[in-house]
C-alpha cells in the first residue's frame, strides 16, 4: 500500500540524521512531505481544509499555481524535512528578506508542497500566525474576466507585472483554511516565513 511503499522506507534516513524529537511552539523536528508528483496538492489541501464542501472550488487559489523559486530543488518522491521552523520568529520580516536570512544560516525556505505538509501534520501552527512559503512563487497572474474564474479577487495592476508573489497559508472566517499569495516585500505582524535545516530523500 501507499504507506509501505512510500513512507516506511524513509525511516532509515532518521537513524543517521536526527536525534531531536522535541516539538516546541515554533519548532518541529521532522516532517514527511508528499510532493505533487505523487499526490496532487489540491487533493491534499482539500483533505485538510475545513468546511470544504461549503466553498466554491473555482474561487480557491490552487497549489498548482505555484512553482519552486529560482534555485530551489525538491525531490519528486516523498521525503523528509528536518528542523522545521514554522515562521513565528520571522513575523514582521518580508519573505524576500527571510530568504536571504535563511541562506546566510544555511537553511531553506519551505515550498508550497512543504507548507501543506506542515499544516497537515500540525494545523495548530496557523493559530499563532500566517505561514509564508517563499520557497515557491506564483506563476499564474491572470487579468480581466479570467481573474474571477481563476479565483483571484482582482487583476494585478501593470506595476506588478514583474513582481514576485509567494504562497501563504492562513485561517480566516472562523478557522477556514485558506491558501493565498503575498508580495515578497510585504511586511506584516501576523505573517512569517517557514524554513527547514535540510531535505532528505532516498
Predicted features along the sequence, with ranges:
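A binding-site-centric feature that preferentially detects glycan-recognition modules on secreted/surface proteins
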Residues: 1-108, 115-202
